[in-house]
UniProtKB/Swiss-Prot annotation:
The organism's taxonomic lineage, starting at the top: Bacteria, Pseudomonadati, Acidobacteriota, Terriglobia, Terriglobales
GO biological process: translation
Protein name: Large ribosomal subunit protein bL28
GO terms under cellular component: ribonucleoprotein complex; ribosome
Protein family (similarity comment): Belongs to the bacterial ribosomal protein bL28 family.
Keyword Ribosomal protein: yes
SUPFAM superfamilies, per the entry: L28p-like
GO molecular-function terms, A-Z: structural constituent of ribosome
Keywords from the UniProt entry: Ribonucleoprotein, Ribosomal protein
InterPro entries: Bacterial_rp_bL28, Ribosomal_bL28, Ribosomal_bL28/bL31-like_sf, Ribosomal_bL28_bact-type, Ribosomal_bL28_sf
Length: 62
């Protein structure tokens, strides 16, 4: 399952782990997603929404 917010489409960011000895390995920062039941067009729908969208009040919880 993709780590993508159903409201805003925000996905993971990619970068590097850099150790003290400057060894570099790839890593990713996932989005903080929460399963939510929300009302969309009058119907209840299960969504995976990032906490930024939850706090902004963009959706109405069912």
């Amino acid at each position: 399952m993709a780590q993508v917010c159903d409201m805003c489409g925000k996905g993971p960011q990619f970068g590097n782990n850099i150790s003290h000895a400057h060894n570099v390995t790839k890593r990713r920062w996932n989005v903080n997603l929460r399963p939510v039941r929300a009302k969309v067009n009058g119907a209840t729908k299960r969504m995976r929404v990032c906490t930024t969208c939850l706090r902004s009040g963009k959706l109405v919880k069912a």
